[in-house]
């Protein structure tokens, strides 16, 4: 995997008249594993949406390999895997069909044998043919997380990936994240849980809180 570099420069986020955070700088390079921390409402999800290009910052820039992401969107999206709060799966399709669909549209490894291996890893063997809409919220979350094992993307942006996942699942995912960064990837995530990794760097959004109210003009 080539060396990559994500830069957040003087980012500020505003929701209505409230400024959630300001003057946030972050350099994440190949091999970095970053956890965004902060209390509810501080703007963790908003920050991730800015990083992936789904929202715009009140000020500041996001760069991928020194180029602003809005000027290099196709290459950036090719290198990006984003998993948000919602599972983002098709409920009418089975777990197997959802993963096959993702293989077709994403930057993914193509292997039927790999699909079986992933279904076993996420505990869905025996349920692979059931419509995803008939599965529990935790099982639907596992379908979404299964994309991680398929993805060739360098940059993983994950919003609360451990929600509805048991302790064993947390350990399995953490090992996967560590393997990804060891291979030159970048992982940025939010989580309220303690993550069992000594590779983790933590960023507290509270440090960038803007206490006065007003516009960023």
From Swiss-Prot:
ATP binds at residues 38-45. GO terms for molecular function: ABC-type heme transporter activity; ATP binding; ATP hydrolysis activity. It catalyses: heme b(in) + ATP + H2O = heme b(out) + ADP + phosphate + H(+). The keyword Oxidoreductase does not apply. One of its GO terms (cellular component) is plasma membrane. It is a peripheral membrane protein. Its EC number is 7.6.2.5. It holds the Pfam family ABC_tran. Its main location: membrane. It is found in: Cell inner membrane. GO terms for biological process: cytochrome complex assembly. Residues 6-216 form the ABC transporter domain. Keywords: ATP-binding, Cell inner membrane, Cell membrane, Cytochrome c-type biogenesis, Membrane, Nucleotide-binding, Translocase, Transport. Part of the ABC transporter complex CcmAB involved in the biogenesis of c-type cytochromes; once thought to export heme, this seems not to be the case, but its exact role is uncertain. Responsible for energy coupling to the transport system. Belongs to the ABC transporter superfamily. CcmA exporter (TC 3.A.1.107) family. The complex is composed of two ATP-binding proteins (CcmA) and two transmembrane proteins (CcmB). This is Cytochrome c biogenesis ATP-binding export protein CcmA. It comes from Histophilus somni (strain 129Pt) (Haemophilus somnus). The gene is ccmA.
């Amino acid at each position: 995997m080539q060396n990559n570099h994500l830069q957040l420069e003087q980012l500020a986020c505003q929701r209505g008249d409230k400024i959630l955070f300001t003057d946030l700088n972050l350099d994440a390079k190949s091999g970095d594993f970053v956890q965004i921390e902060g209390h509810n409402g501080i703007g963790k999800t908003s920050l991730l949406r800015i990083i992936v290009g789904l929202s715009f910052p009140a000020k500041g820039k996001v760069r991928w390999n020194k180029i602003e992401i809005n000027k290099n969107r196709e290459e950036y999206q090719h290198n990006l895997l984003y998993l948000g709060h919602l599972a983002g799966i098709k409920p009418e399709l089975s777990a197997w069909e959802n993963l096959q669909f993702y293989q077709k549209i994403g930057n993914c490894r193509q292997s039927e044998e790999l699909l079986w291996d992933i279904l076993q890893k996420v505990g869905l063997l025996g349920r692979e043919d059931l419509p995803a809409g008939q599965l529990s919220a935790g099982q639907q979350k596992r379908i979404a997380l299964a994309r991680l094992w398929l993805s060739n993307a360098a940059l993983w942006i994950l919003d609360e990936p451990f929600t509805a996942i048991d302790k064993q699942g947390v350990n399995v995912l953490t090992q996967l994240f560590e393997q990804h960064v060891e291979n030159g990837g970048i992982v940025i995530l939010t989580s309220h849980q303690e993550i069992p990794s000594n590779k983790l760097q933590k960023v507290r959004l509270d440090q960038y809180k803007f206490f006065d109210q007003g516009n960023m003009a």
